[in-house]
Amino acid sequence: MSKKYLSQRISLPLTLLFGFLLIGSVVAAEADPWLRPDFAPAPPENQLTPERVHLGMLLFFDPRLSKKMSMSCASCHNPSLGWSDGLPTAVGFDMHTLARATPTIVNTSFSPIQMWDGRKSTLEDQATGPIEAAGEMNLPLPELIERLKSIPGYASKFEAAYPGMGITAVTVARGLASFERTVLSTESPFDRWRKGDQKAVSASAKHGFELFQDKAKCAVCHMGYNFTDNGFHNIGLKTEGEPDVGRYAQRPLKSMHGAFKTPTLRDIGLTAPYMRNGSYKTLMEVVEHYDRGGDDKTNLDLNMVPLSLTASEKTDLVAFLESLTGVPADVRLPALPH
């Protein structure tokens, strides 16, 4: 993808960002299931350190991780666009259009399974997939490792992050995963309201949250502080051409045919267009899709039924959804090693 899609101002300085992960109102998060924890869980073999997060940030923004050195992870996961790309479906190597929308990486640290079809279980498993995918960054991992080893400035960064382990596919994946664990949603008006600020959201948004939990049935799948059950559902999207089987490719069960992972709703105001195929430009269109009970009834999830929402109820739901978006973090492009 062209660099024009990547904003030059992108979250918190690294030291503040890392500190933010480790301190905060964990007690409040435990007391209110709709408030996310202020820390990112990490596996024992890849606990977060400032050095690992810094290495991962460098790799994430480095276009040298792609075949033609023309795109980085941030080309598709742009911080100023909610860590997505603002396109209906992703654009990869040589401007090749992919079949699915770029998912946000916000709060992926809280997800036990990754990607639209769940084919990767951890951030470490997922991290290098786009790099070597022919349609995405198209750089074989052995070639990537040799390229990184040829850049003198990376040697000390890898050593500081993973002493004695060298520059390998494992340390590249762990570094990227470490940075991605710091990509967390910022405080939204909804969060401030849940913490006691009654003026943080409108009466319309408050009513929308009530609808979200009952009549509209949204919380059946979009539950908890990350607004996802991390499950897979067929929501009846219209498709053109060959149907995308979704989770069925990984788990060939009838219920999984056409099913895709429930995305987070955090920062949803920044991640249009919506759905796994980018088919809706606005949140109102999304609400109307669910109000219809979906369009393609083939293998439809049992929870997808017509809702009979009124016009004002739809407006209230949109107001609530918009309240889930915080201020974009002020990430700055790092100086890359030479």
PLM segments and residue spans:
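Bacterial N-terminal signal peptides
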Residues: P13-S25
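Periplasmic c-type cytochrome electron-transfer domains
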Residues: Y5, S11, V27-H338
